[in-house]
């Protein structure tokens, strides 16, 4: 932590098409080597695929998917008397969003479809339907927290 106090959070500018900060954050999360244009193109094509397949607004499907991915609980390692305990803690709202976006992008990249547009679109659709690898990651995280409930009193 800096000596001058906590660092101020930088506000992300909303994206030009959907005027959403969430979409802008997803674009930033997908970006590799600073190529924002490529990242935007991939995301917008994915949203077109989603709209085509569902007939619903892509933004609504994306928000539902993200809501299904974002974790409520996670475990943090805490050292007590020479032993490490996995202590369940609640996830802060900003971290929930960050984890949700991170898992969405990571598991979309691991999928088997040919293009990233298809991978991302399918992962978002799966997440919106409460299936897919990103939702499984959330369930595993919650299971871990539930299994280590006994150590909840070590919370800080």
UniProtKB/Swiss-Prot annotation:
This is Small ribosomal subunit protein uS7. Belongs to the universal ribosomal protein uS7 family. The keyword rRNA-binding applies. GO terms for molecular function: rRNA binding; structural constituent of ribosome; tRNA binding. HAMAP family: Ribosomal_uS7_B. GO terms for cellular component: small ribosomal subunit. The keyword Ribonucleoprotein applies. NCBIfam families: rpsG_bact. One of its GO terms (biological process) is translation.
